[in-house]
Amino acid sequence: MQLEKELSRRKIKELLLEILSIYTPSGEEERAKDFFEKVSKEFNLNLEISKSKSYFLGKGDILLASHIDTVPGFIQPKIEGEVIYGRGAVDAKGPLIAMLLATYILNEKGYKVQFAALADEEGKSKGARELANSGIRYNYIIIGEPSNTLDVIVEYRGVLHLDILCRGNSQHSSSSKENLIVDLSKKILEIYREPSNYENFSIVPTIIKSGDYINMTPSEGYLHLDIRYSIKNSKDEILALIHNEFKTCDIKIVEDIEPVKVDVNSNIVKAVMRGIIKQGYKPKLARKAGTSDMNILKNIAKEIVTYGPGNSTLEHTNNEKISIDEIFIALTTYINAIEELCLKKK
């Protein structure tokens, strides 16, 4: 058993350093093709590459899914002791490697498990959307995102991204009676909802553009709103609030991702929790204020949950790092959980 652990840890180090050396920001996932072709041969798992440049290994009605893309900004991989640094070490190449090795080990044991390295999670989630529209269905899906190694994520908020275009009369600034910038500012203050607690929805302006001339009031103003809301909030009521304030403006929904909340008593949540407990650690249920591919893939699985190694506060930072211990705990958790789920099916 100790030998198996040491072999797994060496493989974690080898594969993670290799994948971190491949820069794969959203839209450039094809750079990882050689890596997955090599792993496919080494692990004897069939490789499929989708149109979105997502990578699938193996077949089965249980899916371990993480994402191969990262936010921009390459960080040269390095290792200090048992800690590995690099862009994506936490989000989400650390979880991805844990899932990749778990898929190999489980298939070697005779379990039919599929692995997915999805594209564009940091963008518009093209990989997850493609999979959701493919017609494929799974009994269980575990999403690999950093969850502090011991947290099991059962809830994510939803998101709305709105483009708003307002029009007014352009006048000389020395004698203007109308000012679209002032009007827009008043409207923003009326609808602004500062992020506070999880249950309360937030409405945050992130882009505002207006005006072309230093001595003329603008004829057009553009505003982008980022709205986050929980399962307890009404999307229709939020949109009604926006439409009521911007009655004369054009409003376009450019992204709409529903919130997700899973049953904490589901088989998959319990299996992941027990998978952690078996190693002598204490797991806890958690929820995240953002969104993930779990929001999109919830409808193609009978049961779904998010779990993975890594300190989530390090996501997207220039200090992304993860320990081999964290990845090994997650790897073991995936194996424990899926073995339990497969035994329940028999």
From Swiss-Prot:
Principal location class: cytoplasm
Free-text cofactor note: Binds 2 Zn(2+) or Co(2+) ions per subunit.
Record: residues binding Zn(2+) 1: 67, 91, 145
Gene Ontology cellular-component terms listed: cytoplasm
GO terms classed as biological process: arginine biosynthetic process via ornithine; L-arginine biosynthetic process; lysine biosynthetic process via aminoadipic acid
Subcellular location, record wording: Cytoplasm
Chain's role: Catalyzes the release of L-lysine from [LysW]-gamma-L-lysine and the release of L-ornithine from [LysW]-L-ornithine.
NCBIfam families from the UniProt entry: dapE-lys-deAc, PRK00466.1
Protein name according to UniProt: [LysW]-lysine/[LysW]-ornithine hydrolase
Encoding gene per record: lysK
